[in-house]
A protein has these predicted regions:
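A SIS-like phosphosugar-recognition module
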Residues: 1-130
Length: 130
């Protein structure tokens, strides 16, 4: 199935990214980074950027003899600004809506979330709130 999800590279490296690289299917992966750090810790940024680039290469470089491959796209921002971050968020909102239409899924209907809330309030002995 289709999944639109993300995580920080360092936190996801030993779980989600490993599943993407070594899993049993092909997938499309987007990695996003900025060419300009949003802080003054140059060495920290240098390591994070190297991590992102190495992760991109590792996600593409699956066993060439195997039946699966990953298509990895990198979105490189020149800097993280409210405008650029908003544009990236809008792009993924649009992607989620379009994929929902393509797969005949309503991404705005969340019966699982509603069921969770109903169960949680019941366990807490509280009435449901809207």
């Amino acid at each position: 199935g289709m999944l639109v999800w993300g995580s920080n590279g360092n936190e996801a490296q030993h779980s989600f990214y490993q599943w993407l690289r070594d899993g049993t299917g092909s997938t499309s992966i987007d990695l996003i980074w900025s060419e300009m750090p949003g802080h003054r810790y140059a060495e920290h940024y240098r390591v994070l950027l190297a991590n992102a680039r190495a992760q991109a290469e590792a996600l593409v470089a699956r066993d060439p003899k195997g039946p699966y491959f990953n298509a990895v796209s990198t979105i490189v921002l020149d800097a993280v600004t409210p405008r650029r971050l908003g544009a990236v968020m809008a792009m993924y909102e649009h992607k989620t809506t379009m994929l929902g239409t393509l797969y005949n899924i309503n991404p705005f209907d969340q019966p699982g979330v509603e069921a969770y809330k109903k169960n949680m309030f019941s366990l807490l002995g509280k009435p449901e709130t809207n």
